[in-house]
């Protein structure tokens, strides 16, 4: 009986060791660093995340490795809770507190868990305005800070589906974000003159705003383009707050900008309207590490494979952008890097990670 009992764990170890052996694999650590490497080194940037795999590796690097402790990871799932908002309003390492304008009484459990979006009330307000000055006051009440500090805090509702706020053009220029070509002048003053004066946030087709979305609006107002805001590429599009057209990709994250690239007609990677800052993305991707994926006989479970495919996909995407610009040399450099770091012997090619496009690019580059 003793021998039979001993054989059971031996059998289990013998049959399952290979698919539990993580020796030599540091992908989670490095992938977490790759997200943080996407963020600029100035301005104490904030990155919105959503799930476990785009959050916990980042937290590990902040808390254990001490890597990029100037940044802040803000999980949108947790941002629904008062205790997590409390954390975000406190400094952490070299990261200052997040500029959320709400006091605890305005976001404690049971308060502003959600607010209604009632655009029909806009017409009622305008109809009741007797003079031009009163109508002007109504329109001014739809400014972002007025929405946050008056309508939400006092009435727990939003009487419009279009919010606006005035742009700090000097802060935008200092931020280092990609300025659309349409707004670029010969001097900073010319550029500012070409920029729009306001940013508009559409709440169309939204009946309610959840607490995390309210906090996102508060952060957009509080950061004022001086503290960069990013959205992880793994966040579902339904959590974009209709800002997808304002995203520009710089790696494993989209920078949130005041410019609607989609309306400007910029070529989108997908239906969300995201475009690529090729210079920043190239600089970032060439510094990424891959946790030993080029080693032989490395076991990759389903979760790691999915994270690997996300990485391979953005390299192929960047190479495609360079090909559009006729920059064939850098397109090949990008493809060669990901193929070297993530060889097919470790991670087989698959249609879900644009491998067909990768093959077409290599074929085309051979002719250039």
Regions found by a protein language model. Give the residues of each.
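ER/secretory pathway lumenal C-terminal domains and tails of membrane proteins involved
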Residues: 1-44, 56-368
């Amino acid at each position: 009986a003793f021998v039979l009992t001993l054989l059971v764990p031996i059998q289990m170890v013998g049959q399952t060791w290979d698919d539990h052996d993580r020796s030599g694999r540091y992908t989670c650590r490095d992938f977490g660093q790759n997200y943080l490497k996407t963020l600029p080194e100035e301005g104490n940037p904030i990155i919105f995340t959503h799930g476990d795999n785009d959050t916990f590796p980042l937290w590990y690097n902040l808390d254990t490795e001490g890597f990029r402790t100037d940044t802040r990871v803000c999980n949108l799932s947790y941002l629904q809770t008062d205790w997590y908002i409390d954390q975000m309003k406190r400094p952490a390492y070299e990261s200052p507190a997040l500029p959320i304008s709400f006091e605890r009484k305005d976001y404690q459990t049971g308060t502003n868990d959600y607010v209604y979006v009632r655009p029909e009330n806009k017409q009622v307000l305008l109809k009741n305005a007797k003079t031009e000055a009163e109508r002007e006051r109504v329109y001014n009440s739809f400014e972002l800070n007025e929405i946050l500090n008056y309508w939400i805090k006092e009435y727990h509702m939003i009487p419009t589906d279009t919010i606006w706020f005035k742009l700090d053009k000097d802060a935008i220029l200092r931020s280092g974000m990609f300025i659309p070509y349409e707004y670029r002048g010969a001097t900073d003053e010319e550029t500012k003159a070409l920029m729009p004066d306001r940013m508009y946030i559409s709440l169309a087709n939204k009946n309610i705003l959840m607490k995390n979305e309210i906090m996102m609006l508060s952060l957009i107002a509080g950061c004022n383009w001086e503290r960069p805001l990013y959205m992880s590429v793994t966040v579902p599009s339904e959590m974009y707050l209709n800002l997808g057209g304002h995203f520009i990709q710089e790696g494993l994250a989209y920078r949130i900008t005041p410019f609607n690239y989609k309306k400007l007609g910029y070529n989108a990677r997908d239906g969300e309207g995201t475009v690529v800052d090729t210079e920043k993305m190239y600089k970032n991707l060439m510094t990424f590490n891959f946790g030993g994926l080029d080693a032989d006989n490395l076991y990759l479970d389903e979760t790691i494979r999915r994270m690997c495919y996300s990485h391979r996909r953005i390299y192929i995407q960047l190479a495609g952008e360079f090909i559009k610009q006729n920059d064939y040399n850098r397109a090949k450099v990008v493809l060669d890097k990901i193929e070297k770091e993530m060889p097919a012997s470790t991670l087989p090619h698959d249609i879900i990670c644009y491998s067909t496009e990768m093959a077409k690019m290599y074929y085309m580059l051979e002719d250039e």
